[in-house]
Regions:
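RNA-contacting regions in translation and RNA-metabolism proteins
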Residues: 1-192
Length: 192
């Protein structure tokens, strides 16, 4: 029925006189003798294709996550720019996207906002920010359950990174004080 994997009984009997219907026949392939250079070239092509597939996967995974907050570890610092290991990818936290007077060491945990993901020749480039106004908004969404549930909405964010920030909030439930819910008991939510 399927000519690529099945043959008729007569052909099978010419190859193996003991063949029975429903049985598997093994057709040995002639040995292929690749030279050292050909084997090395094949290996390089395979490794290159795997790298390309990995880059495509990284780009596909992170392009949909623009605007999210990610956690990572500081891998190294190059010319003031911080290279952050996100687990399955590396991201760049440029010096101008860091909070002033903020200092990182190798191995430090970093929480940052995915600002941009670009497809470039040397692979996808993920750019992070700790000064973006939406970074503060996303942190509040994580920290304040009322914002996460949609009872309180963030209307606007203005900040001077490293010193102060102002967030305009509105409550759609008259019984909930939006500022009090965001500040928390003795400022516990703001301090977090």
């Amino acid at each position: 029925e399927n000519e690529t994997i099945q043959i008729d009984l007569e052909t099978a009997l010419t190859k193996d006189p003991d063949a029975v219907p429903g049985e598997f026949l093994i057709d040995p392939l002639p040995p292929i003798d690749f030279g050292r250079i050909a084997a090395q070239t094949a290996k390089q092509v395979i490794v290159q294709k795997v790298r390309e597939a990995e880059r495509t996967r990284q780009y596909g995974e992170y392009k949909d996550r623009i605007g999210e907050i990610v956690n990572g570890l500081v891998k190294r610092i190059e010319y003031g720019n911080v290279i952050v290991d996100l687990g399955r990818a590396e991201a760049h936290l440029r010096r101008d996207e860091c909070i002033p007077r903020e200092h990182f060491n190798n191995g430090d945990r970093v929480r940052a906002y995915i600002m941009d993901v670009r497809e470039e020749t040397r692979g996808p480039q993920i750019f992070l920010s700790r000064t973006h106004p939406q970074f503060m908004a996303k942190l509040f969404i994580q920290e304040v359950p009322e914002i996460y549930d949609g009872v309180i909405e963030i209307k606007a964010v203005a900040r001077d990174p490293g010193s102060r920030a102002k967030i305009a909030v509105i409550s759609y439930d008259g019984s909930i004080d939006p500022v009090g819910a965001c500040v928390g008991m003795r400022g516990s939510r703001v301090q977090a």
